From Swiss-Prot:
Its main location: secreted. It comes from the Eukaryota. Belongs to the snaclec family. N-glycosylated. This is Snaclec factor X-activator 2 light chain 2. The keyword Methyltransferase does not apply. It comes from Vipera ammodytes ammodytes (Western sand viper). Residues 11-16 form the C-type lectin domain. One of its GO terms (cellular component) is extracellular region. Calcium is required for ligand binding. The gene is LC2.
């Protein structure tokens, strides 16, 4: 899984 930077949504198109 891709780890989101702080402030990103877990459902962002670039975040899985």
């Amino acid at each position: 899984a891709f780890c989101c930077p702080s402030g990103w949504s877990a459902y962002d198109q670039n975040c899985y």
